[in-house]
Amino acid sequence: MEFLSFPLSSALLIILLFMLVKKAIQNKNSKLPPGPRKLPVIGSLHHLIGDGLPHHALRNLAKKHGPLMHLQLGENSTLVVSSSKMARAIMSTHDLMFANRTVQFATDILLYGGKGIGLAPYGDYWRQIRKICVLELLSAKRVQSFQTVREEEISNLIRSISAESSKVNFSEMITSLTNDIIARAAFGEKCKDKHAFLSLIEEGIQLAGGFDIAGLFPSLKLLHVITGKKRQLERVHNELDRILVDIIKENKEKRRASKLNEDKYEENLVDVLVRVQENTQLEVPLANDNLKAVILDIFVAGSETSSTTIEWAMSEMLKNPKVMKKAQAEVRRVFSGNKKINETEIQELSYLKLVLKETLRLHAPAPLLIPRECRESCEIDGYEIPKKTMVMVNAWAIGRDPENWSNGDRFEPERFDGISVDYKGTNFEYIPFGAGRRICPGMLFGMANVEVPLARLLYHFDWELPNGIKPEELDMDETFGTTVRRKNHLYLIPTVVHELERSTTKE
């Protein structure tokens, strides 16, 4: 028996040696970018465990292996970009080659298979839906049309804060504010399911955030069932879908009635989508699921990024009292004597704009942006990038790169004074909203929902930390999800400086 087992064990040993030699030869001949050591099955995942947040861990790995780094995250061949030079190569020089998005397990279920603007594959449909977003949904004119919505919702918040006699949960209040602004912009003033919808959006964001084990091994369908994630995602999706079906139906009925009665009304975002859907000249007809996907994109991207940016801006100003004092002095000088603050004057707040630029540099809402996907095999900087490789651009690391930023980890708004660096995608050392064809189309809408609330909160209130916490003691810990938020909610004590004029409140 032992004799018979010898040839078998020898054969197995030979096969194993052959596979190892073959693997070694493949690795030797491979022109993949450098990266850390990979293990069977899990690939490079062990390098991301126990090293803090993903964007931090990836920056640390890039310091060892370079700004163009290859990882194997489970089944996903992954390219990590950590310098402005490599970001330019991916999002400008070879932008078309990397114009696809990676649709993950969770977003595939929640967002109708990636039919929205954020995840749709590059092609005729994506070009059409982006054009609709840029020219119709999120144009400067459309953003301006929601000025009254912003004014009323911010006034409601200011009134609520003024009524508080002690500390407030600033984080929760800002999240509620941005949700309410976007809900009114999307659905109009009356939406019976608004609170249920917003609660489901929050649950969906929590489920989709961060690294997901089932998403790292997409071929192992059993994992999706074992973890229970698929069932949870499908439940949230189905409940959101039910609400969106009713909203779209109501808007279509309103549109038909207005045509019959020749009534005119101010369009909300769903109205715009319904009107565009009726256009028979569209190159790619829009089904209701396309409309739903775009609506969800606006909520998931718009609310999270705006509230996160306000929260970090306030945190940084509290930690840097000189910045807070200077920003408040500017706001109160510009708005001095005004009975009603209007958005035109926001453009005069040059220092506040520097504060927000610096906030976005240090706290890009999505630090790894939305992953791209290589459409065809190509060569970058002498390395071969296989087709279907997922690309993560570490905007957080690039925004702190000492090659581009002196004292990169410090909050210094003045660094932007007198320079033309902006977040519109042409300065690759500063890409909080991405760049190239897939740059965020909602920047105008998002920044309007940041600048106006922050300016008014600085105008109406003085802010201090509770419980005798000193500025230098304020924790700035992060938590990683769809966006990177504060790990702990920001609690503050407001003191009314300028009372709210009755004309700006909405009863």
UniProtKB/Swiss-Prot annotation:
**Keyword Membrane, does the record have it?**
yes
State its location(s).
Membrane
Q: Which UniProt keywords apply?
A: Heme, Iron, Membrane, Metal-binding, Monooxygenase, Oxidoreductase, Transmembrane, Transmembrane helix
- Biotechnology remark: Combinatorially expression of Sinopodophyllum hexandrum (mayapple) genes of the podophyllotoxin pathway (e.g. DIR, PLR, SDH, CYP719A23, OMT3, CYP71CU1, OMT1, 2-ODD, CYP71BE54 and CYP82D61) in Nicotiana benthamiana (tobacco) results in the production of the chemotherapeutic compound etoposide.
A single GO cellular-component term from the record reads: membrane
Q: What does this protein do?
A: Cytochrome P450 involved in the biosynthesis of etoposide, a chemotherapeutic compound of the topoisomerase inhibitor family. Catalyzes the conversion of deoxypodophyllotoxin to desmethyl-deoxypodophyllotoxin.
- The name of this protein is Desmethyl-deoxy-podophyllotoxin synthase
Q: Which organism is it from?
A: Sinopodophyllum hexandrum
